[in-house]
């Protein structure tokens, strides 16, 4: 309810924001990206929302593009609109910059990204304790945050994903409770969110 997620299966517990963003980068994006595809990040990003995408771009041949900020330190929405095109598969942005405190209009970005059938990934680590989070109203595909940003313990986090997107994700870690059935040569996995 707090995130306004449409169903509980859309909320996956992780070890933190970095883990959640890596799961999206390597479990969702990497298997789908190919040479000629584009990933857009901004200069406002924490390393946790930049380095995984650099790695995915290098491994897939996708092009990593970077949107800047305007003279006030805000995301340059005009430049973002120029960068997004039919090759854009992923736009991944912070909701609030950890350096400047810049607040990104996520709903505005989502409208633009979805016009081109891209996905929007949001790093909400800095926003979660200070701003209301409504994943449905913002229309994000994925959103990540950590418990310690809300005075919780370290080592816990959340990955919200639209259910259809989560179902398309490949696991990035294997074993434990995620396994439904295992044979000497293969395994099947539990349904979301355990998988």
Regions flagged by a language model, labelled:
Residues 1-195:
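Pyridoxal 5′-phosphate
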């Amino acid at each position: 309810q707090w995130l306004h997620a449409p169903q509980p299966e859309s909320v996956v517990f992780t070890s933190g924001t970095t883990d959640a963003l890596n799961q999206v980068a390597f479990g969702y994006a990497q298997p789908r990206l190919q040479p000629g595809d584009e990933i857009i990040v901004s200069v406002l990003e924490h390393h946790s929302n930049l380095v995984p995408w650099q790695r995915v771009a290098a491994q897939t041949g996708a092009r990593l593009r970077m949107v800047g900020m305007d003279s006030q330190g805000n995301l340059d929405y005009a430049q973002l609109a120029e960068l997004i095109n039919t090759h854009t598969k992923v736009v991944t942005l912070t909701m609030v910059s950890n350096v400047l405190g810049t607040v990104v209009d996520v709903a505005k970005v989502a409208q633009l990204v979805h016009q081109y059938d891209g996905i929007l990934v949001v790093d909400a680590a800095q926003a979660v304790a200070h701003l209301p989070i409504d994943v449905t109203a913002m229309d994000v595909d994925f959103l990540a945050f950590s418990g310690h940003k809300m005075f919780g313990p370290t080592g816990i986090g959340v990955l919200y994903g639209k259910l259809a997107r989560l179902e398309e994700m490949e696991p990035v870690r294997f074993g434990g409770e995620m396994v439904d059935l295992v044979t000497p040569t293969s395994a099947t996995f539990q349904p979301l969110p355990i998988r």
